[in-house]
């Protein structure tokens, strides 16, 4: 039976910039002992830990022992075209991913935004394995939720939770109206309609996974 472990990497959040912000200039396959990452999330599949973070097209690393990390290719080979077309100022620097194993697939949620604005979107992609050597690509399904300048919320920093009845929810947000909670569809590709947002923190706060 496949065992999967998800761990919130709050301790790594303090290690800003570094490899995650060097983008395509970082040599893939290089082994490092102290990867500097921003907004990390980690999952374990089999005997390997996989770390994803803010970076160009979502940075990724893998490790067998949580000590030595191999720099892997970015999740996407190019910025999602739907995000480039719909979010002015977005050029592929993708923020604050979240990972969840759900109904046979790994689901990746990621943030696309223009810095300092709430013209943003949270995207979704899925894959059956986290193994970067697999021939199976991430299948991107596009935007889960979008925020515009007229909205009092910011569609970034997603975190997925499953309630006691098995229903999927997403917390997200940063500044503006604070942290929001919204129900997702069973396939996790969009918000449940009619869409209803619940504000769970109204201060200028970010980090929905902390709530």
Describe these PLM feature segments.
Residues 1-23:
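Bacterial Sec-dependent N-terminal signal peptides
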Residues 19-211:
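Carbohydrate-active catalytic/glycan-binding domains of CAZyme proteins
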């Amino acid at each position: 039976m496949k065992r999967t472990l998800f761990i919130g990497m709050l301790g790594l959040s303090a290690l800003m910039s570094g490899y995650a912000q060097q983008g395509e200039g970082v040599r893939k396959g290089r082994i490092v002992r102290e990867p500097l990452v921003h907004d990390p999330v980690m999952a374990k599949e089999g005997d390997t830990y996989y770390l994803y973070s803010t970076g160009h097209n979502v940075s990724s690393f893998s490790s067998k022992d949580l000590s030595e990390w191999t720099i892997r290719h970015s999740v996407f080979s190019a910025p999602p075209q739907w995000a480039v077309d719909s979010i002015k100022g977005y050029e592929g620097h993708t923020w604050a991913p979240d990972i969840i194993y759900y109904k046979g697939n790994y689901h990746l949620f990621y943030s696309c935004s223009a810095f300092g604005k709430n013209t943003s979107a949270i995207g979704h992609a899925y894959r059956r394995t986290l193994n970067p050597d697999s021939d199976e690509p991430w299948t991107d399904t596009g935007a889960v939720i979008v925020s515009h300048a007229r909205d009092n919320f910011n569609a970034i920093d997603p975190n997925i939770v499953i309630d006691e009845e098995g229903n999927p929810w997403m917390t997200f947000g940063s500044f503006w109206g604070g942290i929001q909670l919204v129900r997702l569809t069973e396939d996790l590709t969009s918000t449940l309609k009619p869409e209803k947002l619940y504000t769970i923190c109204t201060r200028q706060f970010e980090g929905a996974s902390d709530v």
